[in-house]
């Protein structure tokens, strides 16, 4: 059981945006100034990792959440809404740079995904954020592959294997049902595609 807990921690969804950003700068053939890339990585790290962690620490301190796992739907509502707003603001900021539009769109995809997750709360559906994160990452890498005509098959296969590990760990830990696992994946994946298609075509 400890193995599955380690998988859940190592592949935590809060890390997805910084991993996506890092892979974007590594993969794309366009020349991006190194200093600019580091600046963007720093902004993404602070906005999507440091700030959410500080928020969770505050919410736990004032006893609005019982644990950092956000086990109940009620505990998830405000953090998800907050993260959606952060992602929207970050997407707008990156879009203004005008040379990393694809990366900016990925954050609009995260905003849309977070919004859908929030709406599903009203149907008492606790979407798996772990599989939402990996689904979004797979969608984003697929978009990069299409946009730049790159063969990223091996990376995509690796990410699908990670999805398998994540899904198995969440099921073994009884954190989610099978439906919640796949809802998370499809919401994460298709929101990236929807935002890209809406902006591009």
Regions found by a protein language model. Give the residues of each.
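The first (N-terminal) embedded transmembrane alpha-helix
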Residues: 7-28
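Cytosolic, membrane-interface loops and tails of multi-pass inner-membrane proteins
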Residues: 57-70
């Amino acid at each position: 059981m400890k193995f599955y807990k380690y998988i859940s921690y190592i592949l935590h969804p809060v890390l997805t945006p910084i991993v996506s950003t890092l892979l974007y700068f590594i993969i794309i053939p366009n020349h991006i100034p190194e200093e600019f890339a580091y600046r963007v990585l720093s902004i993404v790290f602070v906005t999507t990792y440091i700030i959410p962690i500080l928020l969770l620490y505050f919410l736990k301190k004032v006893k609005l959440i019982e644990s950092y796992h956000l086990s109940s739907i009620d505990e998830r509502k405000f953090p998800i809404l907050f993260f959606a707003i952060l992602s929207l603001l970050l997407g707008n900021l990156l879009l203004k740079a005008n040379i990393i539009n694809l990366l900016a769109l990925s954050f609009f995809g995260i905003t849309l995904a977070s919004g859908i997750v929030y709406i599903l709360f009203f149907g008492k559906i606790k979407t798996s954020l772990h599989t939402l994160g990996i689904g979004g990452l797979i969608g984003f890498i697929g978009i990069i592959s299409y946009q730049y005509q790159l063969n990223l098959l091996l990376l995509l296969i690796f990410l699908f294997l990670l999805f398998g590990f994540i899904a198995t760990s969440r099921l073994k830990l009884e954190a989610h049902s099978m439906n919640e696992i796949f809802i998370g994946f499809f919401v994460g994946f298709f929101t990236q595609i929807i935002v890209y298609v809406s902006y591009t075509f």
